[in-house]
Amino acid sequence: MMNERVNKVALIGAGFVGSSYAFALINQGITDELVIIDVNREKAMGDVMDLNHGKAFAPHPVKTSYGTYEDCKDADIVCICAGANQKPGETRLELVEKNLAIFKSIVGEVMASGFDGIFLVATNPVDILTYATWTFSGLPKERVIGSGTTLDSARFRYMLSEYFGAAPQNVHAHIIGEHGDTELPVWSHANIGGVPVQQLLEKHAAYKQDELDQIVDDVKNAAYHIIEKKGATYYGVAMSLARITKAILRNENSILTVSTYLDGQYGVNDVFIGVPAVVNRNGIAGVTELELNETEQAQFSRSANVLKDILAPHFAE
């Protein structure tokens, strides 16, 4: 028993997303140990107490505690959910100035602890802040992962499942690019239970392209609609973070549309962006390069360029 590996996750930021992520980790029994770190010590301690009180109902006993940056030293994953929130009407990219300063401090503190694991970034604009985390940390690019378009792809699969009357698990479709306004659907590879969506459109008059275009629009604007109604989005992204965490800790080699570094794939260099990638215990094991059609490739290149334009003033090559 003494030689058994203990999985440890350090969560930085016990706001809506962070506390929902902690709740998901415990309810799914994904990790053995969870330490919660927040500038608001009382909030983090309250979360720990609340979560521990439900431990009898969890599938796996997760040791949950309040901690400091020093506790990151032996963590397998440090998940960063801290940062300024997106306000109504504010785009994810408008958050960049505020959150870059916050991240420089956080990542510096984590690395000073001796941390040598995997960073998982959730804070928006996630593609920019994942790049920042990689730069500030000095870790290999494979060990810095952003939530990317995992949630966007899940939203897409859910909406397509409702439209076509199939379980989301049987809908295979990706949203790639920036987690934001320039993201795009990969229709050329979308299928329902193995049947290409394009084929379903051709064979069934009930299915219409303009209705599918509306689904894409709904996916892109989902966060804005939720923020209008309840002030923030957190359950969906927390579940996507839990899914990525599970893929890492259980060495799954699962393909997820995370924000990862591109070094020539899809004709793009030096940017973190949402694409399908193999995720395992080492972080990113490889990028899955879909063969995009001409329209998709142009849209993806534009998305990457939008991110690079935002990075340029802050990170000189």
UniProtKB/Swiss-Prot annotation:
Gene Ontology CC: cytoplasm
Substrates-to-products reaction catalysed:
(S)-lactate + NAD(+) = pyruvate + NADH + H(+)
| Residues the entry annotates as binding beta-D-fructose 1,6-bisphosphate | 157, 172
State which Enzyme Commission number(s) the record gives: 1.1.1.27
Sites where Phosphotyrosine occurs are at 224
Which pathway is this protein assigned to? Fermentation; pyruvate fermentation to lactate; (S)-lactate from pyruvate: step 1/1
Q: What is its main location?
A: cytoplasm
What residues bind substrate, as annotated?
86, 92, 124-127, 152-155, 233
Keywords associated with the record = Allosteric enzyme, Cytoplasm, NAD, Oxidoreductase, Phosphoprotein
The question of whether NADP is a record keyword is answered with: no
The family classification in the record reads: Belongs to the LDH/MDH superfamily. LDH family.
Assembly information from the UniProt record:
Homotetramer.
Against PANTHER family, the record matches this protein to: L-2-HYDROXYCARBOXYLATE DEHYDROGENASE (NAD(P)(+)), L-LACTATE DEHYDROGENASE
The function of this protein is: Catalyzes the conversion of lactate to pyruvate.
Protein's recorded name:
L-lactate dehydrogenase
The organism is Bacillus velezensis (strain DSM 23117 / BGSC 10A6 / LMG 26770 / FZB42)
